[in-house]
Amino acid sequence: MGHTAEFIFPVDMKKIPRLDALFIRANTDPMNTTYVAARMAQMYGVPVIDDPSSIQICADKINMYMHLMKKNVSMPRTKFLKKKELDEVLAAQLFEELGMPLVLKEPSTSFSVRVEKVSSVSELLKVARRFFKLSDWIVVQEYIESRFDWRVGVINGQLLYACRYIIPSETFKIQASVNGHIVYCDVESVPADQVPPEVIELGCEAGNAIGKGMYGVDIKESNGKLYVIEVNDNPSLDGGEDAHYPDMFQKIISYLMTGDACSYADELSNKVSLSHDFEGEYGLGAATGMSNPSALTENEVCSYKIDF
């Protein structure tokens, strides 16, 4: 395509304003240098993957799920549990409302760490208390059983690739520590014409709920219904996901170097750092990527039917 690429590192941050585009391929987090690089690109109108807004949203599961809720994206029934409300009565109520087992997630989780399945009140209390050492809020979801997850890669609202993550028999996650050993999912790339259209449609819908960048959308199917499990910025591209998509990197480069990415970069650079895209009880938390919805009522386990 006539483009060249060079690797840059934290010491090269001063080069960013002179770049035509920035493609981040390191673990992203609002608390590390990848976010600084993304923000600098945003400030100078340099097209960037991943953009700082996407990093903020996807780094906080509560923030991410609220973006999906706002757009009515299909997802498991979900509640946000506040630290000071945790007790046996509430734990039992969660099982009544969401079923058994439940999945608990600490909001800053990544790579399936701090995601656990619980099947009793005592187990829920034990895991929740451990997660509450890291966050004042945790995510509680109904458990969706499936043999594999669809991973739909999306860029600018369009399909980039699709694959299946075959879940290891020892766990319910795509990656887990089992008896001191890490087990990983198998990856099966699936040609676009063999992916159910509704899977692609839901993946693109979920990506659009977050932004216009590049995302990996995890989807489960159960009893004929599809559920978005999460949306990831900075999705994996080196595990064979693109085996049937030889033009994947061409699409990424084309996006970065065309008007769509440039327009999005300009749009982001014109936003104030604390945007108020969400007006409601979680407004500031959703906009800044912080799980701190302090305005919620005292006795509330925040329902998935949040009024925006």
Please report, for each region that a protein language model flagged, where it lies by residue:
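ATP-binding N-terminal substructure of ATP-dependent carboxylate-amine bond-forming enzymes
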Residues: 1-49, 305
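Active-site nucleotide/adenylate-binding loops and adjacent lid/helix of ATP-dependent enzymes
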Residues: 16, 41-45, 53-150, 193-201, ...
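Short glycine-rich anion-binding loops that position phosphate/pyrophosphate groups of nucleotides
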Residues: 27-29, 108-109, 234
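Glycine/Thr-rich phosphate-binding loops of Rossmann-like dinucleotide-binding domains
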Residues: 31-32, 112, 225
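ATP-dependent carboxylate/phosphate-activation module, predominantly the ATP-grasp catalytic core
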Residues: 119-132, 137, 141-209, 221, ...
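Hydrophobic residue at the +6 position relative to the catalytic HRD Asp in the kinase catalytic loop
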Residues: 217-219
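Short, hydrophobic alpha-helical segments
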Residues: 256-264
